[in-house]
From Swiss-Prot:
SS bond partners: none
Known role: Involved in the biosynthesis of the chorismate, which leads to the biosynthesis of aromatic amino acids. Catalyzes the reversible NADPH linked reduction of 3-dehydroshikimate (DHSA) to yield shikimate (SA).
Pathway(s) this gene product operates in, as recorded in its UniProt entry: Metabolic intermediate biosynthesis; chorismate biosynthesis; chorismate from D-erythrose 4-phosphate and phosphoenolpyruvate: step 4/7
The entry's keywords: Amino-acid biosynthesis, Aromatic amino acid biosynthesis, NADP, Oxidoreductase
Entry's EC annotation: 1.1.1.25
Protein name per UniProt: Shikimate dehydrogenase (NADP(+))
Residue positions of the active site: K64 (proton acceptor)
Species, as recorded: Exiguobacterium sibiricum (strain DSM 17290 / CCUG 55495 / CIP 109462 / JCM 13490 / 255-15)
Substrates-to-products reaction catalysed: shikimate + NADP(+) = 3-dehydroshikimate + NADPH + H(+)
Record's keyword annotation contains S-adenosyl-L-methionine: no
Protein's gene: aroE
Matches recorded under HAMAP family: Shikimate_DH_AroE
Amino acids binding shikimate: S13, L14, S15, T60, N85, D100, Y204
Oligomer status and interactors: Homodimer.
A Gene Ontology BP annotation from the UniProt entry: amino acid biosynthetic process
Amino acid sequence: MQFAVIGHPIAHSLSPMLHETWLKAAGLFGCYTTLDVEGDGLEAFVQKVRKRQFDGINVTIPHKSAIIPFLDRLEPAAARAGAVNTVYWDGEELVGANTDGTGFARALATWTNAKNSLVIGAGGAARGIIPMLPGHVTVMNRTNQTAEQVAAEFGQSAVPWSRTLDLTPYDVIINTTSVGMAPAIDQTPIELTATTALICDIIYRPTPTRLLREATANGLDTLDGVLMFVLQAAEAFERFTGHKPDIALGEQVIRKQLEES
């Protein structure tokens, strides 16, 4: 069995370690690699997949939306999000799925106060997460027009970008941008003032991000990107192989690797 994650850049991905851990635990013989695919090479790569050179692929920035025209059909969540992070075979069809939202929803399941959420960013991950959130969602993005478009698609609202936004209305705040990831590891997308919200960051390298460190220092509850990463990967793995992976094992392996790197 041959699997891969594609993106540009892609060298930072921990997906190979996670999926190969699960393959071994399931007694399956397979290989999972990272492939740096630039935009103009995406269609040619999908043609390789169609020749059964791969049994499944994961998709990350910047291809989550760009890959859609090259697939046969989309799962409902991917169609709603307009973004794909998993491509798998269903018979002779290449199917696009989006497990970002369900992965985040499972990670958030123990938090019962999610009635008014702020989502920072309006890219593929945000589009996957927004429809899975309970209650009202407000979208904030550096390009306000994009925030308004994405919010309107899901019947939600948008606010103009501001690092000093009044956070008092929100009980959950989710960073879906790359702010906090290298090379911007010393930056945060917002200033955490006058809030009691759960602070979430989908970034898993580094962990915790500066945003989460500041949240902890302020006595706030936090949710890092590791569990979401593992849960969305687990849903992809099940589509690829038909096997349910060990979530605890996956989280343990990833956290250990992050601590050592």
